[in-house]
Regions:
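GH16 jelly-roll
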Residues: 1-146
Length: 146
């Protein structure tokens, strides 16, 4: 529908979370898109990002570079030991680094060593003129362990 938002995101498997609950356990948004915008957002959530330092640059970072509205796009994420690296159509769009904080168990900046599961979702954006159904076309999803 014309008033839908689409998302491709990762949430931790609660059985293996290093930190329990949200946002402490982390959330990785590879793609968030609203019909209201001509860009996508890539976002990282953790206790550190959402509670300790909410003025950071990792909440809903707009991505214009490489994004082709109305076409299939390829989104990527490398989950590495010390960083999360995001891609759109082969272009690196964002990197979030492990800060190796001395007080990590208090700050909970890097919960991204847990196992995560993939969520593909659509949802209404705003309450005006809601119409159904809502679609998100996905050609393929590939997961590779490095």
């Amino acid at each position: 529908s014309d008033n839908a938002g689409q998302a491709f995101w990762l949430m931790p498997d609660s059985r293996y979370q290093i930190y329990k609950g949200w946002p402490d356990g982390g959330e990785i948004d590879i793609l968030e898109h609203s019909y209201l915008h001509d860009y996508i957002q890539q976002t990282v959530h953790s206790h550190y990002i959402d509670v300790v330092d909410p003025s950071n640059n990792y909440q809903g970072k707009p991505v214009y570079k490489g994004y082709n509205p109305g076409q299939y796009n390829i989104y990527g994420l490398d989950i590495l030991e010390n960083s999360l690296v995001f891609y759109t159509n082969g272009e690196k769009t964002m990197t979030y680094e492990n800060m190796h904080l001395a007080n990590e168990t208090e700050m909970k900046q890097w919960p991204f060593i847990s196992d995560y599961y993939i969520i593909l979702s659509t949802s209404p954006v705003g309450a005006k003129n809601l119409s159904a159904p809502s679609y998100m076309y996905v050609d393929w999803v590939r997961v590779t362990k490095l």
